[in-house]
């Protein structure tokens, strides 16, 4: 049996899970409004990523440019700031 490697060992002391959760909680209102074809796609890709054992930090990282553009266009500077802070710390 091989040992499980923690790929986030360098994030010790950083609540990246909580930060990712907070960002997704804020994104949920945009997802629910579905004013862009991106949101249903993004939701499907998140479910697929989870089924492959990937976490929300990875999902956010994969869609960072698109999320940044959408949040800027919607004027959601709070969520954009949270996403950019997470990017600086963990991505």
Swiss-Prot record:
Pfam families: CowN. Keywords: Nitrogen fixation. The keyword 4Fe-4S does not apply. One of its GO terms (biological process) is nitrogen fixation. Coiled coil: none annotated. It comes from the Bacteria. The keyword Ligase does not apply. NCBIfam families: N2Fix_CO_CowN (NF033689). Belongs to the CowN family. HAMAP family: CowN (MF_02117). Is required to sustain N(2)-dependent growth in the presence of low levels of carbon monoxide (CO). Probably acts by protecting the N(2) fixation ability of the nitrogenase complex, which is inactivated in the presence of CO. This is N(2)-fixation sustaining protein CowN. The gene is cowN.
